[in-house]
């Protein structure tokens, strides 16, 4: 039986809305499969090649990361993977803290005994802390839709570090500088210019040259009275 994408999308939406709400204890199990199905599934995170199942994976808010699934069909009938989902669980209690968006995909059919793989991108916007990531696959098998839950992976969600060379930050800095420069120019024209004009220093006039001072080094005796000259000569004789 084939399932159309709209039907699968409706099923996934109904599952996310009600499956864990109907059975709170189910959300605490982060390792067991939801159904008994001979279908082995594992996954890795390609951009973290050194992170194993027991290691801590670090991912960042606002950035996409890829989950690469690998699986083997050990049933005696075909199995089709028709959707992906999952959840981030609390590390201590196992309770669901956030669901991955359940999304239908183009069916990946796996015949009995066959293995396969595919990748799915995930984007994050979570409170930065440590979680248990538990991906899920939605399987079409034996005329029914079933859920297969993969293993849990310790995952730490972080905010992206801010860099001074970040283009968005540089643009913001340029806008702020232009804004402050504009405000400073307006303030100067309204208040500053008047203030500086009102307190400008007045230049003092330059002092004129001092009038010449008469000296007694040389005296023209033609205009002196005769008595004065005679008196002067008498003093010299004495």
Curated annotation (Swiss-Prot):
Q: Which GO terms describe its cellular component?
A: endoplasmic reticulum membrane
Keyword Endoplasmic reticulum assigned to the entry: answer is: yes
Source domain of life is Eukaryota
Task: Alphabetically list the UniProt keywords.
Answer: Endoplasmic reticulum, Membrane, Signal, Transmembrane, Transmembrane helix
Q: Which intervals of the chain form a coiled coil?
A: none
Q: Which residues form the signal peptide?
A: 1-21
Tell me where in or outside the cell this protein is found.
Endoplasmic reticulum membrane
Lumenal-facing ranges: 22-169
List residues traversing the bilayer.
Answer: 170-190
Indicate the principal place this protein occupies in or around the cell.
Answer: endoplasmic reticulum
Tell me which Pfam families the record gives.
TRAP_alpha
For membrane topology, the record states:
Single-pass type I membrane protein
Which residues are on the Cytoplasmic side of the membrane? 191-238
Per the similarity annotation, which family is this? Belongs to the IRC22 family.
Please explain the role this protein plays, according to its UniProt record.
Is probably involved in a pathway contributing to genomic integrity.
Q: What is this protein called?
A: Increased recombination centers protein 22
Q: Which species? A: Meyerozyma guilliermondii (strain ATCC 6260 / CBS 566 / DSM 6381 / JCM 1539 / NBRC 10279 / NRRL Y-324)
Q: What gene is behind this protein? A: IRC22
């Amino acid at each position: 039986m084939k399932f159309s994408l709209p039907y699968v999308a409706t099923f996934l939406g109904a599952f996310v809305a009600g499956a864990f709400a109907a059975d709170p204890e189910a959300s605490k199990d982060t390792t067991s499969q939801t159904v008994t199905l001979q279908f082995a599934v594992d996954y890795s995170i390609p951009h973290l090649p050194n992170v194993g199942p027991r290691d801590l994976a670090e991912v960042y808010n606002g950035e996409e990361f890829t989950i690469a699934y690998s699986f083997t069909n050990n049933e005696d009938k075909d199995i089709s993977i028709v959707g992906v989902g999952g959840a981030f669980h609390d590390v201590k209690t196992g309770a669901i803290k956030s669901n991955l968006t359940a999304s239908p995909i183009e069916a990946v059919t796996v015949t009995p005994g066959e293995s396969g793989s595919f990748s799915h991108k995930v984007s994050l916007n979570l409170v930065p802390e440590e979680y248990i990531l538990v991906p899920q696959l939605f399987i079409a098998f034996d005329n029914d839709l079933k859920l297969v839950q993969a293993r849990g992976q310790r995952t730490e969600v972080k905010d992206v570090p801010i860099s001074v060379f970040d283009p968005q930050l540089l643009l913001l800095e340029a806008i702020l500088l232009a804004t402050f420069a504009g405000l400073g120019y307006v303030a100067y024209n309204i208040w500053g210019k008047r203030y500086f004009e009102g307190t400008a220093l007045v230049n003092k006039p330059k002092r004129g040259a001092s009038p010449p001072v008469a000296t007694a080094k040389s005296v023209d005796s033609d205009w002196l009275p005769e008595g004065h000259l005679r008196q002067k000569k008498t003093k010299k004789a004495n």
